[in-house]
Design a protein with these regions (language model features):
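Hydrophobic alpha-helical connector segments
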Residues: 54-58, 67-97, 148-152
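Amphipathic alpha-helical packing segments from all-alpha helical-bundle domains
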Residues: 64, 82, 94-98, 112-138, ...
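Short, charged helix-capping/linker segments at alpha-helix termini
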Residues: 23-24, 68, 139-146
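Amphipathic, non-transmembrane alpha-helical scaffold segments
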Residues: 2, 10, 56, 60, ...
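Amphipathic C-terminal alpha-helical segment
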Residues: 91, 132, 153-171, 182-189
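Helix-turn-helix
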Residues: 8, 12-50, 54
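N-terminal intrinsically disordered/low-complexity leader segments
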Residues: 1-4, 74, 187-189
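Short helix-capping/turn signature of helix-turn-helix
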Residues: 45, 103-110
Length: 189
């Protein structure tokens, strides 16, 4: 089945939001990118807030699927944890973009409520997944796993932000290696 106009709008909106955040969701610019009239976007998304919420929802849903696939592909929790930073690296590889959840989190005070809710779900999905992997790998006790998961999520998002600000993907790799050497991320032997 081919992509619908709605899918094309959401894909274009995702790229715009990864490069420019919520404020980068310009209806006219998205319409030009997709090759439709701006009114057509309003048919699918009656407001910018609804578009922002829909693109943020799709982003965390895609991330949840990516994390599930990562776990299935790697076969064990420790390997999955060691591959986790690569999810964030892919955004940098794609036009030096930032994780959309991180970008929109930085704009949090200016986001409409429905967008805030979806952005929070992105962080929740990542922290929950990390917490489970940490427990399954035997790296943390259940009562400590969420705290370490938040630290890992925050550190990797921060590494991505710093690498983007320098347009230097190798800096991201260096920071991730540093986190592993410091014991925040597991090292596979």
């Amino acid at each position: 089945m081919g992509k619908t106009s709605r899918d094309e709008i959401l894909n274009a909106a995702r790229l715009a939001a990864q490069a420019h955040g919520y404020t980068g969701l310009n209806i006219r610019g998205l319409a030009d990118e997709v090759g439709i009239k701006a009114a057509s976007i309003y048919y699918h998304f009656p407001s910018k807030a609804e578009l922002g919420a829909a693109v943020a929802q799709r982003y965390w849903e895609d991330t949840a699927r990516d994390l599930a696939t990562l776990r299935e592909t790697e076969g064990d929790a420790l390997k999955s944890l060691s591959r986790y930073p690569h999810i964030f690296r892919r955004s940098l590889e794609s036009g030096n973009r930032l994780c959309m959840g991180s970008f929109m989190s930085a704009e949090y005070d200016d986001l409409p409520e429905p967008v805030k809710e979806e952005v929070q779900k992105f962080a929740d999905v990542n922290v929950a997944w990390l917490s489970i992997q940490l427990q399954e790998a035997g790296l943390t006790a259940p009562e400590e796993s969420e705290k370490r998961a938040r630290a890992i999520f925050s550190a990797i998002a921060g590494a991505q932000l710093m690498a983007r600000s320098r347009n230097d993907i190798h800096l991201f790799d260096e920071l991730i290696d540093g986190y592993a050497q410091a014991g925040l991320l597991p090292v596979q032997g």
